[in-house]
């Protein structure tokens, strides 16, 4: 069995689709909802991966736990580390529960792409890349946790990932979704995260994305491409 942390972004969605085509129900998609996603995104992710793909989908509602951990935290890098560390806590708890049910998981798939590795100055660049920022999916496993790692996109760039997603039959609203950081809206908020700031940002982001989608549709019609 293979476990995958599904964020709903392009990268993890393409890996999920790829694994689903190969192993079906042997894939366990764990969607950790930290409450920092875009407006209506959790519902959209669940709909796609419960109706279109025959996988084991687990929705973890961790909004309250993340809110407590991020309370009063203002530094962006500190937010990234907190969100990444708690992700592993949530993820490992699910993996443990699965193992206790007699269905242990050996492999873990990740949506790591080559720019993630470059920005983090990580191992596959041969140590030649300087660290630009940390990525929550490149933080080492917690002590005592081990999976055989599967990273099918680790030599792909974003445009190549999108092309693969289209070929695998993912819907356009997933494949062409605007880039979004793994730690979510927390690092787009200056200062501490609060429910009020999150609500304002979710609504503002939804308006901007709606306008961009409308513009792109008009451009597509005008050029006839």
Q: Can you name each region flagged by the protein language model?
A:
Residues 29-32, 70, 74-79, 144-154, ...:
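Short beta-alpha connecting loops at secondary-structure transitions
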Residues 2-6, 10-47, 139:
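ATP-dependent adenylation/pyrophosphate-handling site
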Residues 26-28, 56-58, 148:
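Conserved beta-strand segments of alpha/beta enzyme cores
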Residues 12, 38, 42, 76, ...:
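Generic structural signal for well-ordered, non-membrane alpha-helical segments
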Residues 110, 115-120, 148, 152-225:
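Mid-to-C-terminal catalytic subdomains of enzymes
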Residues 10-18, 64, 110-117:
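Core structural elements
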Residues 42-78, 85-98, 102-113, 125, ...:
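A conserved beta-strand->alpha-helix junction
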């Amino acid at each position: 069995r293979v476990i995958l942390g599904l964020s709903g972004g392009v990268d993890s969605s393409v890996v999920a689709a790829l694994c689903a085509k190969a192993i079906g129900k042997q894939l366990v998609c764990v969607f950790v909802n930290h409450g920092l996603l875009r407006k209506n995104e959790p519902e959209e992710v669940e709909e796609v991966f419960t109706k279109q793909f025959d996988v084991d989908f687990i929705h973890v509602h961790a909004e309250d736990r993340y809110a407590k951990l991020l309370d009063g935290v203002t530094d962006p890098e500190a937010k990234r580390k907190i969100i990444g560390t708690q992700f592993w806590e949530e993820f490992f708890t699910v993996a443990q529960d699965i193992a206790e049910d007699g269905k242990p998981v050996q492999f873990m798939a990740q949506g790591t792409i080559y720019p993630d590795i470059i920005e983090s100055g990580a191992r596959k660049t041969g140590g030649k890349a300087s660290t630009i920022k940390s990525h929550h999916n490149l933080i080492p496993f917690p002590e005592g946790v081990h999976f055989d790692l599967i990273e099918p996109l680790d030599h792909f760039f974003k445009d190549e990932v999108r092309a693969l997603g289209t070929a695998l039959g993912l819907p356009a609203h997933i494949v062409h979704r605007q880039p979004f950081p793994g730690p979510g809206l927390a690092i787009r908020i200056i200062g501490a995260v609060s429910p009020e700031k999150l609500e304002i940002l979710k609504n503002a982001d939804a308006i901007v994305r709606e306008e961009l989608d409308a513009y792109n549709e008009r451009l597509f019609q005008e050029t006839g491409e």
